[in-house]
């Protein structure tokens, strides 16, 4: 069977990542087993692979290392790094003495994408989010007043807006590059000065000052793990491991 050639000049969406893992498992059946540690909040499988030479003993009887990536939605480089690690070990087994020794005597458990829902939203829309797509702590923020992110000009990006405010503006244009804003110093009176806002719209606008609407995605999966969890920690969720993505990892380990 021909060995898969994966691309590392792009970020894989969920279906592409799934196919890459399936292809690797099919191409190296003696070294790679594909499984799922559970499902995400939206029902996607959270894939993991077990890497070891099965001919030299069961994976569960060897010293092991655990690797995961993409706990936060935007950490797509982490998932691609984990995928590259899998690919590298498999491709170099039997060619590189150290890789061969590792897979003969050790086990690798690799979860490339802990949070497939958040990564998919991050990769396919202009929106930014910290972690999970589950609405929290509010069920619905659409009627709340204030500024909320939106792709106003339809270019596929949500950037920043500079609004002139010579009295209270905290930023000014860089003297080196007019595209860059630099912080205003405390004694700086040589404007113009600006305020920076996320590109977006203001719901129920009644003039300044206006508020910023809470994000619909307030969870931080990294703060949902049992270690050092606290009920008032920002983004920590309802209780330790309340989120399926975190519970999947906790139960697996």
Where are these regions (language model features)?
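M14 metallocarboxypeptidase catalytic domain recognition
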Residues: 1-253
